[in-house]
Amino acid sequence: MANRLKEKYLKEVVPSLTEKFNYSSVMAVPKVDKIVLNMGVGDAVSNAKNLEKAAEELALISGQKPLITKAKKSIAGFRLREGVAIGAKVTLRGERMYEFLDKLVSVSLPRVRDFHGVPTKSFDGRGNYTLGVKEQLIFPEINFDDVDKTRGLDIVIVTTANTDEESRELLTGLGMPFAK
């Protein structure tokens, strides 16, 4: 069974993007390549339990086991040594990616307090979009009673679009609520 958002992409978004940007081939139409979820846990240096809890929450949100990220360099000011575990990340592709994007757009983002749309300035110039979430409680999988501390996470949506304009049209077509 194909995902609802993937069907919407194939039936509605591809024809509208082809019409707007005059693509010669269906393969030239931009698509979402992958979604990377990253949770930096700065206090993991002093308490390793915080990193375990963050990785557990990231696994619940994404439905996939996260990769523990380690410090590349030692930074004395942060009491950080090279090779110490300081975060967790997950890369979503295929069905899980579409499921997560659908859930993010239709369930999670509307649960944000005082939500007026996601900022339009978060494109990187190459057609990728980065979104910061201040607390993990907006995701329905996270049980409010089990949370010891609110943690934010970064969501990077990598697309095959060449420009920010194409990427924005793609994400708008998929239902991303951009601020007016």
From Swiss-Prot:
Q: Is rRNA-binding included in the keywords of this UniProt record?
A: yes
MF term (GO), any: rRNA binding
List, in alphabetical order, the GO biological process terms annotated in this UniProt record: translation
Recorded hits in Pfam families, A to Z, give:
Ribosomal_L5 (PF00281), Ribosomal_L5_C (PF00673)
Cite the Gene3D superfamilies for this sequence. Answer: 3.30.1440.10
Q: Tell me which domain of life the UniProt entry assigns to the organism this sequence originates from.
A: Bacteria
- The answer to whether the entry has keyword Cytoplasm is no
| InterPro entries given in the database record | Ribosomal_uL5 (IPR002132), Ribosomal_uL5_bac-type (IPR020930), Ribosomal_uL5_C (IPR031309), Ribosomal_uL5_CS (IPR020929), Ribosomal_uL5_dom_sf (IPR022803), Ribosomal_uL5_N (IPR031310)
Assigned keywords, A-Z? Ribonucleoprotein, Ribosomal protein, RNA-binding, rRNA-binding, tRNA-binding
Cellular component annotations (GO), alphabetically ordered = ribonucleoprotein complex; ribosome
PROSITE patterns cross-referenced by the UniProt entry: RIBOSOMAL_L5
Coiled-coil-forming residues are none
UniProt xrefs under SUPFAM superfamilies: RL5-like
Partners and quaternary state? Part of the 50S ribosomal subunit; part of the 5S rRNA/L5/L18/L25 subcomplex. Contacts the 5S rRNA and the P site tRNA. Forms a bridge to the 30S subunit in the 70S ribosome.
HAMAP family noted in UniProt? Ribosomal_uL5_B
- Give the family per the record: Belongs to the universal ribosomal protein uL5 family.
Functionally, this protein is described as follows: This is one of the proteins that bind and probably mediate the attachment of the 5S RNA into the large ribosomal subunit, where it forms part of the central protuberance. In the 70S ribosome it contacts protein S13 of the 30S subunit (bridge B1b), connecting the 2 subunits; this bridge is implicated in subunit movement. Contacts the P site tRNA; the 5S rRNA and some of its associated proteins might help stabilize positioning of ribosome-bound tRNAs.
Q: What is this protein called?
A: Large ribosomal subunit protein uL5
This protein's encoding gene = rplE
